[in-house]
Amino acid sequence: MTEVGWWKLTFLRKKKSTPKVLYEIPDTYTQSEGGAEPPRPDSGNPNSNFNTRLEKIVDKNTKGKHVKVSNSGRFKEKKKVRASLAENPNLFDDREGKGQ
């Protein structure tokens, strides 16, 4: 009988337990007893909800100002550059008058 090498055991992934409930039934669907068809949003296009969510994600004016996408596709956080004392010489002048 052959034994499994120790190196094979290190690279095996354990199976994650699957959730008992794979999806949730929306409350609006359970409240409509007689209707065989689930209620739809006011717009006729089923992708309209998806499109509005996508616009919120892609909208560069409101969110993601502090994030930059590099050439490799990773998100890089833009860091604020602090003003130096050379640019603001009067920044700490009020401390000298207080005796500190």
Curated annotation (Swiss-Prot):
It comes from the Eukaryota. Residues 26-100 are annotated as: Disordered. InterPro entries: PRR15. Residues 53-62 have a biased composition (Basic and acidic residues). It holds the Pfam family ATAD4. PANTHER family: PROLINE-RICH PROTEIN 15-LIKE PROTEIN, PTHR14581. Belongs to the PRR15 family. This is Proline-rich protein 15-like protein. It comes from Bos taurus (Bovine). The lineage of its organism: Eukaryota, Metazoa, Chordata, Craniata, Vertebrata. The gene is PRR15L.
